[in-house]
Amino acid sequence: MQFDHYHIRLLEQSDAAAYFELIDTNRPRLEDIFAGLVSQAKNLEEASAFLSGAEERIKAKTYFPFVVVDTTSGRLIGFIDVKNIDWNIPTAELGCFMDTQHAGKGIAKKALLLVIEYLFNTFDFLKLLIRTHESNSAARTLATQCGFGIEGHIRRDYRTTKGELVDLLYYGLSRN
């Protein structure tokens, strides 16, 4: 998938160093929002182990981690993962973040819209979900700009890196 000078593709084992750099550079702002990803990439070795596991999950179609690559620099500048997949419906949850230097430029919206189209057309998902904390205005805006509607406010639904249980807003998008 491509747009402007960006390419979206699945994360690969050869991305270990670049993936770790993306996480590490953005760690302070990701720690509570992407607790799982951050906790599995404390160093390059852990990031590499995460990628090995991710490759197996991709083959099993239980997880799809996509990266947004700046084709002019070759750098990974964003991450979109498809997780909590339920093939019985089929439905999945999306998570997304951009490198702080590329946030707020509309890149995430274009990338997410392409991934959504890909998921609906390639895997016949009937519904996609985004969960976010109510204070994450960027994620809430991104969800609504991509056609998601708020479906609920779930209390004490997510444990942050610091161990705090927080409420989440659920946004859903059904295939037309």
Residue ranges and their predicted role:
Residues 1-18, 22-29, 65, 69-176:
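Acyl-donor (CoA/ACP) binding surface of acyl/acetyltransferases
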Residues 39-40, 52-67:
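A short helix-loop-beta-strand connector motif used in the catalytic cores of GNAT acetyltransferases and
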